[in-house]
Amino acid sequence: MGFLFSINRKLKMPRDGNEGMFTIPGFSQIQFEGFCRFIDQGLMEEFHKFPKIEDTDQEIEFQLFVERYQLVEPLIKERDAVYESLTYSSELYVPAGLIWKTGRDMQEQTIFIGNIPLMNSLGTFIVNGIYRIVINQILQSPGIYYRSELDHNGISVYTSTIISDWGGRSELEIDRKSRIWARVSRKQKISILVLSSAMGSNLREILDNVCYPEIFLSFLNDREKKKIGSKENAILEFYQQFACVGGDPVFSESLCKELQKKFFQQRCELGRIGRRNMNRRLNLDIPQSNTFLLPRDVLAAADHLIGMKFGMGTLDDMNHLKNKRIRSVADLLQDQFGLALVRLENAVRGTICGAIRHKLILTPQNLVSSTSLTTTYESFFGLHPLSQVLDRTNPLTQIVHGRKLSYLGPGGLTGRTASFRIRDIHPSHYGRICPIDTSEGINVGLIGSLAIHARIGHWGSIESPFYEVYQRSKETKMVFLSPSRDEYYTVATGNSLALNRGGIQEEQIVPARYRQEFLTIAWEQIHLRSIFPFQYFSIGASLIPFIEHNDANRALMSSNMQRQAVPLSRSEKCIVGTGLERQAALDSGVSAIAECEGKIIHTDTHKIVLSGHGDTISIPLVMYQRSNKNTCMHQNPQVRRGKCIKKGQILADGAATVGGELALGKNVLVAYMPWEGYNFEDAVLISERLVYEDIYTSFHIRKYEIQTHVTSQGPERITHEIPHLEAHLLRNLDRNGIVALGSWVETGDILVGKLTPQTANESSYAPEDRLLRAILGIQVSTAKETCLKLPIGGRGRVIDVRWIQKKGGSSYNPETIRVYISQKREIKVGDKVAGRHGNKGIISKILSRQDMPYLQDGTPVDMVFNPLGVPSRMNVGQIFECSLGLAGDLLDRHYRIAPFDERYEQEASRKLVFSELYEASKQTANPWVFEPEYPGKSRIFDGRTGDPFEQPVLIGKSYILKLIHQVDDKIHGRSSGHYALVTQQPLRGRAKQGGQRVGEMEVWALEGFGVAHILQEMLTYKSDHIRARQEVLGTTIIGGTIPTPEDAPESFRLLVRELRSLALELNHFLVSEKNFQINRKEA
C-alpha cells in the first residue's frame, strides 16, 4: 500500500506552573484524523468486501489484489487546482487478475480504479476548483433502548426499540397480560415466539435462553404452537404480518429473499457499534465480529423488558450523548467508496458477459472503468447535504465550519419535525458540545459546534479530557472521558484551576457534576476536574471576553456574527481578548509559517525565499485572492531580508490577522448615550473619521465569467469588434476582446466581447441592411451580440483575467473566461456593525468629527451606541470590555482574560477594570479617566455647542466588527423592468430587477390614510395594468395628463379565468340611469 498523506499536528500552551504543559489539539485535527482513518482503515475494509467475480459458466474469474493498492501523489498543486477549476485528488491503482480456470492461466495488471479527492492542509477538499468541507453528523447510535409511555388509561407501557446500523427500527412491547409482541410495522405486530422461530430458534431453545420461561408459556396456545411448529411456518406467518398480505402464501426461496432484503437487512444489521452497545446493555458476550441481530439478542431484550415491567432496570435517555454516534468524514467517505465498488462490481459483471457473448479478448484493464469511483465522489461532494461549500468570509469562519455537528442530513432529523427536547442542552454536552454556539432560526439546536478540547473516539463518541484528582499529591493524569463513563465519576465544574502551589484545592466545597446533576459537594469526593476554563465552549464562544457577564442568547449571536466579520484593509489586534486569538489564526492556515529555521534571502509581495539546511525554499504568498463570499484574502510579508528565523515563526500575516493573532475588527472610541434619536432601536452614529482614515475600509473581489460554446450554427467568437454598440462601452477591451488588466469599469461596460452565430433569413435583416446588400453587395453580419456586461453595483478595478482553455474545445468542454474586479468599500449608512457581545446595529448617520461628542482632552468619539441596548439584553460584558479597553489604550497594554474569573474572587472583573482605569488615570495625569463618583463614566461635551451633557457618559475602547451585510449588496431600486408572464406583475428580488410588493397590510395602511389615487396607482399603473402603464410612459415623455384606466387590471382577469376553470362565470354590468337597461361588459 502506498500512502502519501500525513498530518499530525498539535500545539502546546503553558498552563499552571505546577503542572507543566498540556496540549490544545489543532482546531482542524478532527477533519485530519477522520480522513487518515478513512485512508488507513476504511479503504481496506471496503476492499475486502469486493468479491471474486465469475462469468455465468464459471470459466473466468476476476479478482483484485487489494493488499497492494497504491495512492499516487497528486499531479497538480492545490493552487493550480483552484486556478484551473480542477479536483485536487489522488489516483488509485490496484493490481487485478483475470484467471481462466480451464487452462489455469492468470493475467495480472495494475489497473486505474479512479480518483479519490484528497484533503488539503486546511482540512478541506478542492472539487472542481471549489473549497468544500464535510461536516460531522450526529445520529442515534445503533443498539437497543428502553422507554415507557402512558396509555389512554394512564398505565405505563414499556417498549424496547432496536435500531439497526441502517437506521431501521423494530420494537418489542409488553401488554397488560405480560404478553410480548414484536411490532414489525406501524399497524402489525407478531408474537415474540414467531419472530424468534423465524430467525431460526425452536421452542426448546427459546425456553432455555430466557429467564422467565413461564411468561412465554403463558400465551402459548394451540394456534401459536402451529405457527412455530417449524421454521417455514414461522417465516410464512412473519411474512404475512410484515407484508400485510392476505390468503395463504406458499413458502419459497423468493419469499425468503424478499424478507431478507426488506426486513432483516435493513432492521437487523447492527454493525460494529450496534453490536458493542447491544452487548453492553444486555450483558451479552457475543463476538464483535457478529454484527447481525441474533435470536439470543431478541430473547435477552424480552427478558430485560419483563424486568422493566416489574420495576427492575433503568430507562434510557435517548438524548444522552452516550446514545448518539458521530458520523464523521471517514464514515461518509467509506460509505461512498463501498457504493462505488458495488457499481464497479456490477459493471465488471456486465462487461464480462458482453465480452464472452461477442467473443472479445479480455484483459483486466479493459474490464474496469474509472467512472464508477470518480462519478460517485463527484456526486457526493456536489449533492450530499453534509458536503458544503467552505465558508471563507474570514479565517475564523474556515475553522469553525469544519467543527460543526449536524442532526440534519440523510438518516437524521429535519428542521420541521425535530422536537424541543432534541434541540435543548443536555448535561452530557458538558465539555463536548458547546451549549452556546448554534444556528438561529428553524435549525436552532440542530446544528452545534464541538467544544475546543473535544475529540471523536474510535466508536464514534465525543470524548472530553479531564484531570484525575489525587488527594494530597501533585501527580496529575489526563483521561479522555466518553459520555457512557460520565455516570461513574464526580467532575468538578467550578474552581478547576484554583489550586495552591501544592496542587491541593483551597476551598472545601466546590460545584460538581454527578449523574447528569449539578451539585455542591466536598472536594474530597471529587474524582475529575476540568483542564481549561474554555473547555466547554466552541471556538467562537471562546473568543468573547467577559462572556460570563452576558446572557447566553447574546453570546450565541456574537459567536455567529464573528463569523460574518469582513477582513479590513488594515487589521488591528484587540486590546481585550481571551488568549485564543493566536491559536485560531494559526489553525486557519491564512498565515505563512516557516517550516524550518533559516535565513531570509529574498522577500517581495509574491514570495518569500528562505535558505536553511543547505536548501532554498520558496514560499509563495496569496495575492488578492477571492473567497466564496467575495472577501479579499491577501498575505503581507512580516520578515525582512537577512533576518534569521526559527521553525514555526510567522513569515506573512493573512487576511484579518496581525502578528499571528486573529484581528477581525478595530478598537474604536465609543460612547453609550442617546444622540438626537439617531441611535434609536440599535442604530449607530459614527464619525466621518472612520470613513476618511479608512478605519473600516474593506476590499471585495467579484468574479464574472462567460463561456464559449460550439452551437449548431458554428462556434461562438471572442472579439473586440462588436457591431451596434457604442464605442465608450468597448473602451476597455484589448485586441482579443477581453477587458485589460488595471482598467476601471463601470456598470454596463463590456468585460468580454462575444458574438454568437445565428440563422440568417431575409426577413430578419433590418431595411438598411437589405439596402446595403442590394446596392453594394456588403455581407451583413448575422451574429448576435452576447457580451459579458458588468451588472448593476459592480464598478471597480480589474485585477485578474483568466482564460481557461480545456482540450477538445467542443460544447462539452467550453472555454471559460473569468474576470475578477476589486471594489474598495468604505463604511457607509446602512452597513451593519457589531461588537463581540451580541450588540449589533446599522449605521444611521455619519457625523462630521467636529459635531461628535468629545472627551475632556478634546478627542472626538468614533461611535455612539444606544445605552438602552444594554440592560434589557443583559450583555454587560461589553461594558467591562469598553472600560478595560480604554485603560489598555492609555497604558499601551493588551489584556488576555480567561472567562469565569469570579471563581477566584468575588467581583473580580469589576476590580480588574477599576484598578486598570485608576492606574491609567494616574499615569496619564487625566483624572477624568477614573472618577470615584461615577467610575467608568466621564463628563463629555456636545461637539455642536461645546456644552457638557447633563449626565456622565460611559466611554471606552470597544472592539467593533464590520459585518458582511453591507448596503451596497442590498440596496435596490426599479423604475420599470421585467414582468411575470401569467400575472403581468413585476418580478420579485434584486437579482431580477424586481419591484416592491404592495401586500394586504400595505393596502390597509394606504386605505387608513385615505390616499385613493396613490392606492389606485399602486394596484394598476405600477403593477399589472398593461395598457395603462404603457400610456403612463408615453405621457411622461410627451407631456399631458395620465388617462384614467377604464378596464380591469390583469390580476383581476386572471382571477376571472381561474373561476371559469371551476365552472363559475363572473361578469360585471352597467345599469343605465334612464331606462334601467343592463349593458353587459366582458371581464
From Swiss-Prot:
Localization in the cell: Plastid, Chloroplast
Transmembrane parts of this sequence: none
EC number(s) reported in the record: 2.7.7.6
Origin species: Acorus calamus var. americanus (American sweet flag)
Family to which the UniProt record says this protein belongs: Belongs to the RNA polymerase beta chain family.
GO biological process, one term: DNA-templated transcription
InterPro entries per UniProt: DNA-dir_RNA_pol_bsu_ext_1_sf (IPR042107), DNA-dir_RNA_pol_su2 (IPR015712), DNA-dir_RNAP_su2_dom (IPR007120), DNA-dir_RNAP_su2_hyb_sf (IPR037033), RNA_pol_bsu_bac (IPR010243), RNA_pol_bsu_CS (IPR007121), RNA_pol_bsu_protrusion (IPR007644), RNA_pol_Rpb2_2 (IPR007642)
Database matches in Pfam families: RNA_pol_Rpb2_1, RNA_pol_Rpb2_2, RNA_pol_Rpb2_3, RNA_pol_Rpb2_6, RNA_pol_Rpb2_7
Superkingdom field: Eukaryota
Subunit structure: In plastids the minimal PEP RNA polymerase catalytic core is composed of four subunits: alpha, beta, beta', and beta''. When a (nuclear-encoded) sigma factor is associated with the core the holoenzyme is formed, which can initiate transcription.
Function of the protein: DNA-dependent RNA polymerase catalyzes the transcription of DNA into RNA using the four ribonucleoside triphosphates as substrates.
Any GO MF annotation of the entry: ribonucleoside binding
Gene Ontology CC, one term: chloroplast
SUPFAM superfamilies found in the cross-reference section: beta and beta-prime subunits of DNA dependent RNA-polymerase
CDD domains in UniProt: RNA_pol_B_RPB2
Alphabetic keyword roster: Chloroplast, DNA-directed RNA polymerase, Nucleotidyltransferase, Plastid, Transcription, Transferase
Catalytic activity: RNA(n) + a ribonucleoside 5'-triphosphate = RNA(n+1) + diphosphate
UniProt protein name: DNA-directed RNA polymerase subunit beta
Major place of residence: plastid
